[in-house]
Design a protein with these regions (language model features):
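Non-heme iron-sulfur electron-transfer modules
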Residues: 5-41, 47, 61-101
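Catalytic or ion-translocation cores adjacent to nucleophile or general acid/base/metal-coordination motifs
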Residues: 12, 63, 69-78, 147-178
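N-terminal leader/propeptide and maturation segments of large enzyme subunits in energy/redox metabolism
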Residues: 173-206
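Alpha-helical scaffold segments in soluble metabolic enzymes
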Residues: 54, 126-131, 193-196
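N-terminal amphipathic, basic-rich helices that act as targeting or association modules
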Residues: 110-142, 146-153
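Glycine- and acidic
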Residues: 37-44, 104-115, 175-180
Length: 206
């Protein structure tokens, strides 16, 4: 799933969870040794889909797995289905995070931005958050990505269940490389200071 705006989610269910699902919540047996005993579904959040059609155009399945339909024909079934899928945690720990398939089972920490429908930037940013999101530090250059990425009061970068997520800042001046390098140096300085304090005080800790 390209999941450009995080409105498409891969879902893994146990047999018991599948039995409790709405009747329209169709699943198939999940493929791969990592997912033995699980059932798989791609769930669309119709209320946040922007209707660009990119996902349907590039879906790699031999038989089209994503088909565009008028939203009015989908909300009645897909909204309850999406809400049901939210009851279960992401199951990325079952597989290799740093693979195309495995990365998609990690929570995207970029959700429902105000970017234009079909934006080519958000898919990459969303994938980065699935790979490194809980420890990402972003120094955003000024441009489209700073508008959809940080226009008050909307902020699409979010946190996981532990409260961890990307740190984001933007410099209006055309110095994003220097600006972000300064963030890197400051981070290293803080870490070094912690090491110095711990080293100095370790003998006094009972």
């Amino acid at each position: 799933s390209s999941d450009l705006h995080a409105s498409i989610r891969p879902v893994l269910l146990t047999g018991k969870e599948k039995e409790s699902a709405p009747e329209s919540f169709e699943t198939i047996k999940a493929l791969g040794k990592d997912f033995k005993g699980y059932y798989f579904r791609i769930q669309v959040n119709t209320l946040d889909c922007q209707g660009c059609g990119n996902c349907a155009d590039i879906c790699p399945a031999k038989k089209p797995a994503l088909i565009m339909r008028p939203i009015a024909t989908q909300n009645e079934t897909q909204v309850p289905n999406y809400n049901y899928s939210l009851k279960f945690s992401y199951r990325g720990d079952l597989t290799n995070r740093f693979s195309v398939k495995g990365s998609q089972f990690y929570q995207p920490l970029l959700e429902f931005s105000g970017a234009c429908a079909g934006c080519g930037e958000t898919g990459y940013a969303k994938l980065l958050t699935q790979l490194f999101g809980e420890r990402m530090v972003i120094g955003n250059a000024t441009g489209c990505s700073s508008i959809w990425g940080g226009s008050a009061p909307s902020f699409p970068y979010c946190t996981n269940q532990d409260g961890h997520g990307p740190t984001w800042a933007n410099s209006l001046f055309e110095d994003s490389a220097e600006f972000t390098y300064g963030m890197f140096l400051g981070h290293n300085q803080q870490r070094q200071r912690v090491v110095e304090l711990m080293t100095r005080d370790r003998k006094s800790v009972v």
